[in-house]
């Protein structure tokens, strides 16, 4: 327990020394909290219409301006952040869990389990997932359809990570502590949960952080193209799509949601890089050597 605590402390110290990663994580948390805490404080809801303020630029009444329907862009952007960030987090958690389960089982047991699971991985990797999701996904307007979208995105987002977990598990299964646990009669399930998964936790944490950005980008792309979340509900993708046509004449309709999307993606990637450097310092040295 002491060794685990000391390693955890060392990882936290490494991460805190990375100012860009710390600032990015703080920005992500601030955006997530703001998306849920600010809407009740605003005078307008995301679906309220102000016919006296159509396509108004940012001002004291509407801080980020309004769109062609007179809807407040600040309220709409916050609503879009709620949907996009929630979908991103859910997809990252589910896909990372699938990757950990499949990779650990495949790498630990080997044999027919390994061949079967890797065949499934190879099959899913060649499937044009984005096109398939766009075809299968209905226009999501309620929570059940949004959950279906989350499951689809997660179902096509775990394969590469599972291969990495499998490789690490194959190297771990012949280590002395794993062999000792087997000789003591510890069940395979307890070995995987208690010994294998904690030793591959670093790659899972990094994968989860980076998957948030990938899932948000995928959901935004689907909504932008007319799939996924659609009006009357909003996501960052639908807001960007609505503002594209008038981006030159009324730039605020496009720029604010697009800027928020870029900020979320950059912060998520910087946070993932910071976690990778903290958990695996050798990777940072290797990247510097390549440069």
From Swiss-Prot:
GO terms for cellular component: plasma membrane. It comes from the Bacteria. Pfam families: BPD_transp_1, OppC_N. The chain crosses the membrane at residues 22-42, 85-105, 116-136, 142-162, 209-229, 247-267. This is Oligopeptide transport system permease protein OppC. It is a multi-pass membrane protein. Residues 81-272 form the ABC transmembrane type-1 domain. It comes from Mycobacterium tuberculosis (strain ATCC 25618 / H37Rv). The keyword Protein transport applies. CDD domains: TM_PBP2. GO terms for molecular function: peptidoglycan peptide transmembrane transporter activity. Belongs to the binding-protein-dependent transport system permease family. OppBC subfamily. The complex is composed of an ATP-binding protein (OppD), two transmembrane proteins (OppB and OppC) and a solute-binding protein (OppA).
């Amino acid at each position: 327990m002491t060794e685990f605590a000391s390693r955890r402390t060392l990882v936290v110290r490494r991460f805190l020394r990375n100012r860009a990663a710390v600032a990015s994580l703080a920005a992500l948390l601030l955006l997530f909290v703001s998306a849920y805490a600010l809407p009740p404080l605003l005078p307008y809801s995301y679906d309220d219409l102000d016919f006296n303020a159509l396509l108004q630029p940012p001002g004291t009444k509407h801080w980020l301006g309004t769109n062609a329907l007179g809807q407040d862009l600040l309220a709409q952007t916050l609503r879009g952040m709620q949907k996009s960030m929630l979908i991103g987090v859910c997809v990252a958690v589910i896909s990372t869990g699938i990757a950990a389960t499949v990779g650990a089982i495949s790498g630990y047991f080997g044999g027919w389990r390994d061949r079967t699971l890797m065949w499934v991985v190879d099959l899913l990797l060649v499937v044009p997932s984005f096109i398939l999701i766009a075809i299968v996904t209905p226009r999501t307007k309620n929570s059940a359809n949004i959950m279906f979208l989350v499951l689809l995105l997660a179902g096509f987002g775990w394969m590469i990570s599972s291969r990495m977990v499998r490789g690490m598990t194959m190297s771990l299964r012949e280590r002395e502590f794993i062999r000792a646990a087997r000789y003591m009669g510890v069940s395979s399930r307890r070995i995987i949960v208690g010994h294998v998964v904690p030793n591959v936790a670093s790659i899972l944490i990094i994968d989860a952080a980076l998957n948030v950005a990938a899932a948000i980008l995928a959901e935004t792309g689907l909504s932008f193209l007319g799939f996924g979340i659609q009006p009357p509900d909003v996501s960052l993708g639908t807001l960007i799509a609505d503002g594209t046509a008038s981006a030159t004449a009324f730039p605020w309709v496009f720029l604010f949601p697009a800027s928020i999307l870029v900020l979320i993606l950059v912060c998520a990637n910087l946070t993932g890089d910071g976690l990778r450097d903290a958990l695996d310092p050798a990777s940072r040295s290797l990247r510097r050597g390549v440069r």
